[in-house]
Amino acid sequence: MAHHNGPRKKTRYKFKKDLRKRGIVPVTSLIQHFEIGQSVHIVCEPSIQKGMPHRRFHGKTGKVIGQRGRAWMLTIFDGNMEKIVIARPQHLKAQK
């Protein structure tokens, strides 16, 4: 087969959900609100492609710096480099 370079390549196991967590996503995850400066975890929701950050940021933790439309802007350190990631709330979980 030909070599493909899609945004979800090499995510066969990374984006796999637990059997009991499959199905419709709760509405509360869609309407989450975060405070600026709050720490959040990036956990990509594989059943919703819209607003999903790049697979390299899956499992990382960042700080909320603002909102852009329905999405949230986060700062994340990728090595020593600070990067801005834009993701919808379905793919974010507040740090406890």
Swiss-Prot record:
InterPro entries: Ribosomal_eL21, Ribosomal_eL21_arc, Ribosomal_eL21_CS, Ribosomal_eL21_sf, Translation_prot_SH3-like_sf. Keywords: Ribonucleoprotein, Ribosomal protein. GO terms for cellular component: ribonucleoprotein complex; ribosome. One of its GO terms (molecular function) is structural constituent of ribosome. Pfam families: Ribosomal_L21e. PROSITE patterns: RIBOSOMAL_L21E. The keyword Transport does not apply. Transmembrane segments: none annotated. GO terms for biological process: translation. PANTHER family: 60S RIBOSOMAL PROTEIN L21. Belongs to the eukaryotic ribosomal protein eL21 family. This is Large ribosomal subunit protein eL21. It comes from Methanosphaerula palustris (strain ATCC BAA-1556 / DSM 19958 / E1-9c).
